[in-house]
């Protein structure tokens, strides 16, 4: 049995037992996440809310707080963390997207004696630095590295990472990992950096990709940081007349991305299993607040995994259910 299986079985067993026994203290858990129309974060939110069913049955609650956009990501997220403290959170979950802006707010969480789990961004290093109980998520650098290595090993040697959230530590790590991965496979890597306002703007991303490819015809591989940006990157490649010549891998996926992988217009997607990030983080804190239960495996990894033509059919049902 894998470590992940042990962790999942432990969480589920504790959740069932806690429903029978009844809580010592109802946990009001606040979760900091992405903006409302971000497809990846909708899956994270579903995971948090599904875990919240147990918390609510015990008289607790799960409250989701997210920014309206990513234009001022670090300061906006820090303000959401402070709001959670002010609203009397018993426990807080949050990603360490922009450490220089967000770490003082996280430090205020632990200084107030509020249990904290870092998820999605920051890794165990951030959890250690901030005094968090656990880190739940993928290792961002390794996710990018997996994409670069995959495309490089497939024979594509000139890669570019499309970064639409400059300054976000996890996105910078994606791109750094991608470049190192394709270099390790004998290629070269670079970054196409766009302003944060371009994130989720399909037209802006597609136009930028088209222009970049026309200016840099040697590029034959691209990596995008989210499912919306990946779709836009595929569109930009097509607009540049480079379909079949420039190969794409992206973070996360959706119905459209899986269809693109089936059709051959996208090579792979990196799966960080956002649903599990939300589910595990909330479950850990609910059990801790109510019963003092801890998970000794402090780094709970949900990725990276690779979805490509070899396993895409197995993933489709999970996407239909809204959990992958």
Description of each model-found segment:
Residues 20-26:
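Sec/Tat signal peptide C-region and signal peptidase I cleavage site
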